[in-house]
Amino acid sequence: MVDFRKFYKENANVAYTVLGYPNLQTSEAFLQRLDQSPIDILELGVAYSDPIADGEIIADAAKIALDQGVDIHSVFELLARIKTKKALVFMVYYNLIFSYGLEKFVKKAKSLGICALIVPELSFEESDDLIKECERYNIALITLVSVTTPKERVKKLVKHAKGFIYLLASIGITGTKSVEEAILQDKVKEIRSFTNLPIFVGFGIQNNQDVKRMRKVADGVIVGTSIVKCFKQGNLDIIMKDIEEIFKK
């Protein structure tokens, strides 16, 4: 199983993008320049018609991608043309994986250099079949923990976790306000008592100020909505500068 610590030094810069937004050409050009960016780990969002975990900005970006005909097949074709030293993670809804076929999807993802899957609406209790395939192909199925998750459940969730722990720093959908820092610190401490895996904080982290604050709390910071916003105007040089600004030390 991949050790995500090898992709960063002190703290991981984790970004999220919707593949196909504003179009596949921009996504491909961005991925070709990924190694020149401060991003250590990139979550690749696969557009889905019913994105229950996503806020308005990400949901709108997914709709634009879908309206242009972006699907899992065009995503796979795009990734087959990409070479990068950075870690690539799929953020994908379970229905897409299920429709494609669990083993077929995981095997294909592995062949394209994907290190891990984040499946936001898949509960721990329903994840056995996908875990089996991920273990077979040495891909991490990422465990999500919320600040509101009770301690006993945290223990259960992280016991067999792989890759990293995704700590949800806000309650609800993406792009909302982050919870108090002290609450997060307590949650990180609690999670650390059960696992040695790195803990990355996401949901509600919007700017460089937030990033700097969260670096003191966890092993890495995940920025989603603000990164997706960078892509709206479509100019790659501006996108790269905006991303530099979000993750600057």
From Swiss-Prot:
Functional pathway: Amino-acid biosynthesis; L-tryptophan biosynthesis; L-tryptophan from chorismate: step 5/5
Residues spanning the signal sequence: none
Catalysed reaction, written as an equation: (1S,2R)-1-C-(indol-3-yl)glycerol 3-phosphate + L-serine = D-glyceraldehyde 3-phosphate + L-tryptophan + H2O
SUPFAM superfamilies for this protein: Ribulose-phoshate binding barrel
Enzyme class: lyase
Active-site feature positions: 43, 54
Record-listed E.C. numbers: 4.2.1.20
GO cellular component annotations of the record: cytosol
Superkingdom of source: Bacteria
Keyword Amino-acid biosynthesis: yes
CDD domains tied to this protein: Tryptophan_synthase_alpha (cd04724)
GO molecular function, one term: tryptophan synthase activity
Alphabetized UniProt keyword annotations: Amino-acid biosynthesis, Aromatic amino acid biosynthesis, Lyase, Tryptophan biosynthesis
Similarity comment text for this entry: Belongs to the TrpA family.
Subunit structure: Tetramer of two alpha and two beta chains.
Role noted for this protein: The alpha subunit is responsible for the aldol cleavage of indoleglycerol phosphate to indole and glyceraldehyde 3-phosphate.
Name of the featured protein: Tryptophan synthase alpha chain
Organism of derivation: Campylobacter jejuni subsp. jejuni serotype O:2 (strain ATCC 700819 / NCTC 11168)
Organism classification: Bacteria, Pseudomonadati, Campylobacterota, Epsilonproteobacteria, Campylobacterales
